[in-house]
Amino acid sequence: MRRYRSVLFLLAVPLLALLACRQEKAAVTTISAQPPEKYVALTFDDGPWPGTTECLLDGLAERDVKATFFLIGEQIGAMEDTVRRMAEEGHQIGNHTYTHMDLSRGDAAERLHEVEETDALLTELLGEGTYWLRPPWGFMAEETAREISVPMVYWSLDTEDWRRLDADEVEREILDNVRDGDIILMHDPYATSVEAALRAIDELRGQGYRFVTLEELFARKGVEPRPGTLYIRPDEVKSSSADQ
C-alpha cells in the first residue's frame, strides 16, 4: 500500500506542476495595441510675467511637459532667471517682438528693429540659437517677412484665453477642438490660462496626446521649417504673411 501511495505521489507531482504552469500562463494579461500617439504644441505669448509664468513652469515640470514661449523683449530684463529656467528645463523660446508691435504697420526699419532687438537679448542671455518668431496678432508685412531669417509661427487653435479669463471655458475650448498636429495659442500672464493649460494636459494625455515644443512637433511631422515662412500648423502655411 505504501508503495502504491509513493507511486501515486510521484505521478501527482508533475501533474500539479503542470497545472500550476497553466494557471500562471492564464494569469498573464494580454495588452491590446495602443492607438498612435498624437502630438500638439502648447505655445504661450506675452511673457515672461511675474508669478504666473513661474507657476506654469512648475506645473509643466511636474508633468514633464515641454512648451514653447514667445517672449516680449522689454519684459525679459526683469525676469532673466525665469527665462534661463525655461531654457534649462527644455522649453523652446521664441521672439514676440520687443514691445508687442503690429508688424504690418509703421516704419519698415522700426518693424525689423523690434524683432532684432529681442533676438539680440535672447542671444546675449541664452547664447546663439534659432529663436522662432510669432508676430503679435499674427500680422506681418510682406516687406518685413522677407527680412526674417527664422521660421514664423501662427496657430491653429486659438483659445482666446485673454478674452475668456475663465479656466473652465478655456479648457473646454481646447478639449472640444484639439486635433493631432495643432499649435495651441495661450498667454501665460493670466492665472486662468495656467490653470486651464495644466488641466487640459492631464485630460488629453489620457486620450493619447503628447505635448511637445514646436521644433519637436515639426520634426515628428516630418516638416523642415523654412525661414521667413509663416506656419499655421506643420502641414499648413499662411497664404500671405500680410493677411489680417
Locations of the language-model features?
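A generic signature of intrinsically disordered, low-complexity regions enriched in glycine/proline
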Residues: 8, 49-50, 165, 192
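Conserved Rossmann-like nucleotide-binding pocket used by diverse enzymes
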Residues: 17, 94, 153
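Catalytic domains of cell-wall/extracellular-matrix polysaccharide-remodeling enzymes
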Residues: 55, 101-210, 215-232
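Terminal accessory/targeting
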Residues: 1-42, 58-68, 180-244
